[in-house]
Swiss-Prot record:
Gene: MCL1
Transmembrane segments: 328-348
Protein name: Induced myeloid leukemia cell differentiation protein Mcl-1 homolog
UniProt entry tagged with the keyword rRNA processing: no
GO cellular component, as recorded: cytosol; membrane; mitochondrial outer membrane; nucleoplasm
Residues modified to Phosphothreonine: T163
Motif (BH1): 252-272
Membrane-topology annotation of the record: Single-pass membrane protein
Region Disordered, residue ranges: 148-170
Residues recorded as bearing Phosphoserine in the entry: S121, S159, S162
UniProt motif BH2: location: 304-319
Amino acid sequence: MFGLKRNAVIGLNLYCGGAGLAAGSGGASSSGGRLVAVGKEATARREVGGGEAGAVIGGSAGASPPATLAPDARRVARPSPIGAEGPDVTATPPKLLFFAATRCASPPEEMEGPAADAIMSPEEELDGYEPEPLGKRPAVLPLLELVGEASSGPGTDGSLPSTPPPAEEEEDELFRQSLEIISRYLREQATGAKDAKPLGGSGAASRKALETLRRVGDGVQRNHETAFQGMLRKLDIKNENDVKSLSRVMVHVFSDGVTNWGRIVTLISFGAFVAKHLKSINQESCIEPLAESITDVLVRTKRDWLVKQRGWDGFVEFFHVEDLEGGIRNVLLAFAGVAGVGAGLAYLIR
């Protein structure tokens, strides 16, 4: 096969008016014989009606061969670099691809410079390719990966899921309902007026939970106002950063592993006490972040317990004064332990 390609190159070079190649100059007579045969065959094809041979060898059907072949005519269309929009066309149409059909890895020794340059090395093939930065997700998923995700989804038609799984929906609903109830209660305590606007989502259940929280939370604040004031002075809450630091103290309330509705309602009641303080120092914008911090601590650390107790429905059903007062005493002791009855709590939230 290599011999045929070599003879084709020699014949083309002589036909275009060039000198014989170095490796084939010694066998000029045999090469010349082959050249005459090739020429006769091409002429016969043109006479029969196939102008394709003339177009490939001479440049156009039925036309006389050109005296010389332009150097760029031996060049081929280089493959476009990876990531490029189109091919990097550097020469004439693909009819002059004398070596493309055989896919040789390197040009023959007799090949001249322009034709040899047309064969790309692996380094040239990757020219223009920019490696993707580590940790960056590709903008478009590969087709096979996208099909695999679609086929493994819950839909039978291969479409991607548009809604989260049921467990995730339940978690989101618990957080949403908790945030709505706690945020509404804290704002009402700060302004001193009830909000008549209906609650969204599970309205009836949330409304009952809010009414229960108003009744129980207001009683906790009245009975333990002095203790709440002492804790507020130690916390020294003045801005949103101080409010965010409060979440560490809330987590400590449940550090002994004991959870009950008494501790939860005491924590929310103290949050309402802090909301009143924020209103008095013109920091009402910090009330919503405070409600989010309380909700995050409760739902994130006590989700399993809340689900087992049926969430806010269980809160509405719960009302035992003994258990409530026992939970309140434990919360106050926990705050005192964090504060160290001194500057320990102030140091903790810095």
